[in-house]
UniProtKB/Swiss-Prot annotation:
PANTHER family the UniProt entry points to: ACETYL-COA ACETYLTRANSFERASE, ACETYL-COA C-ACYLTRANSFERASE
Induction conditions: Induced by low intracellular sterol levels. Also highly induced by cold conditions.
Family, per entry: Belongs to the thiolase-like superfamily. Thiolase family.
Protein name in the entry: Acetyl-CoA acetyltransferase
InterPro entries: Thiolase, Thiolase-like, Thiolase_acyl_enz_int_AS, Thiolase_AS, Thiolase_C, Thiolase_CS, Thiolase_N
Family annotation (SUPFAM superfamilies): Thiolase-like
pH influence on activity: Optimum pH is 8.8.
Additional notes on this entry: Present with 60895 molecules/cell in log phase SD medium.
Catalysed reaction, written as an equation: 2 acetyl-CoA = acetoacetyl-CoA + CoA
Class of the enzyme per the UniProt entry, highest EC level: transferase
Active site: 91, 354, 384
Acyltransferase in keyword set: yes
Originating species: Saccharomyces cerevisiae (strain ATCC 204508 / S288c) (Baker's yeast)
Length: 398
């Protein structure tokens, strides 16, 4: 019951911009690409019989068909006997999937679990609520599925960015600080791309050629190249016109992508002679008032550290926070009194992108890359989610 949980493989797709390079792919198709990439790294595991369960995050599930996680599993070649569950914890969905997978192994219910998440925000549909009963008279409206189910608070109806503005006011974080943070995120991501830091984690996505044109491959994240410093600093505020601080440029963009992590028990690790990449040391989750979701990671991280048996936060080598907004990275670093040089060292979601159901796994995948390439041992990933919550995971590189 207390057996260790190991990460033996990770993979992710490049992250595509909204209506960009990955727009022809559904969330399920992206998820299958990521999972196939992860499977290819562990040929010792037999896809036809060794996998017990898949737990995959997905937020904008409308029009994807039943059970997206199940679709991903079968599209990637896993057995019909695999148990599949789709998780919606908004932005934290894929991290929750990893936590649930680890718990399943810890409890002895499974030995090999696929966890991760997928999202195509580009392909999320518009809804027509009046169509079911029939609009009787006058104009009707289309409801944007991305906005309704992904980007607006369910309790007050306000955009997540309005709450990001509240965070900036409450914690005295300026527009200049947010712009500087965003620019640094882009610059770190660009540098990491140039140096090949993401190469081992990214699986290329093949895009079918149109009208006889050859197929093409998307091999790198699309957003980092879009940095224009002057435009970023002069961008208008979106959510608060007077004295606002949050802009589209210092917030994460709308994106498409998928990530997968393969977890195994110690029993299977030894039986299959697998090489472990990391051990999951612990996890923690927290929640408070929905309007303050931005700094919920600062509540989840201490819980994760306690669960992992780590008493001193300064003993953590690297942190990976999902940058839903620049203010999220800033406020959690501030509250936890972290050294900024240890946070998001390859850049974050402001520059890389934030495909909702994928991001919780993406930050874990990138955190492991950082530990492997920058000489770290202990890493902490954390992500906030709409509704006031957050999830966090502690991993130790092996």
């Amino acid at each position: 019951m207390s057996q260790n949980v190991y990460i033996v493989s990770t993979a992710r797709t490049p992250i595509g911009s909204f209506q960009g390079s990955l727009s022809s792919k559904t969330a399920v198709e992206l998820g299958a690409v990521a999972l196939k990439g992860a499977l290819a790294k562990v040929p010792e595991l037999d896809a036809s019989k060794d996998f017990d369960e898949i737990i995959f995050g997905n937020v904008l599930s409308a029009n994807l068909g039943q059970a997206p996680a199940r679709q991903v599993a079968l599209a990637a070649g896993l057995s019909n006997h695999i148990v599949a569950s789709t998780v919606n914890k908004v932005c934290a969905s894929a991290m929750k999937a990893i936590i649930l997978g680890a718990q399943s192994i810890k409890c002895g219910n499974a030995d090999v679990v696929v966890a991760g998440g997928c999202e195509s925000m580009t392909n999320a549909p518009y809804y027509m609520p009046a169509a079911r009963a029939g609009a009787k008279f006058g104009q009707t409206v289309l409801v944007d599925g991305v906005e309704r189910d992904g980007l607006n608070d369910a309790y007050d109806g306000l955009a997540m960015g309005v709450h990001a503005e509240k965070c900036a006011r409450d914690w005295d974080i300026t527009r200049e600080q947010q712009d500087n943070f965003a620019i640094e995120s882009y610059q770190k991501s660009q540098k990491s791309q140039k140096e090949g830091k993401f190469d081992n984690e990214i699986v290329p996505v093949t895009i079918k050629g149109f009208r006889g044109k050859p197929d093409t491959q998307v091999t790198k994240d699309e957003e980092p190249a879009r940095l224009h410093v002057e435009k970023l600093r002069s961008a208008r505020t979106v959510f608060q016109k007077e004295n606002g601080t949050v802009t589209a440029a210092n917030a994460s963009p709308i994106n498409d992508g998928a990530a997968a992590v393969i977890l195994v028990s110690e029993k299977v690790l030894k039986e299959k002679n697998l090489k472990p990449l990391a051990i999951i040391k612990g996890w923690g989750e927290a929640a408070h008032q929905p309007a303050d979701f931005t700094w919920a990671p600062s509540l989840a991280v201490p819980k994760a550290l306690k669960h992992a048996g780590i008493e001193d936060i300064n003993s953590v080598d690297y942190f990976e926070f999902n940058e839903a907004f620049s203010v999220v990275g800033l406020v959690n670093t501030k509250i936890l009194k972290l050294d900024p040089s240890k946070v998001n060292v390859y850049g974050g979601a402001v520059a890389l992108g934030h495909p909702l159901g994928c991001s919780g796994a993406r930050v874990v995948v990138t955190l492991l890359s950082i530990l492997q390439q920058e000489g770290g041992k202990i890493g902490v990933a954390a992500i906030c989610n709409g509704g006031g919550g957050a999830s966090s995971i502690v991993i130790e590189k092996i």
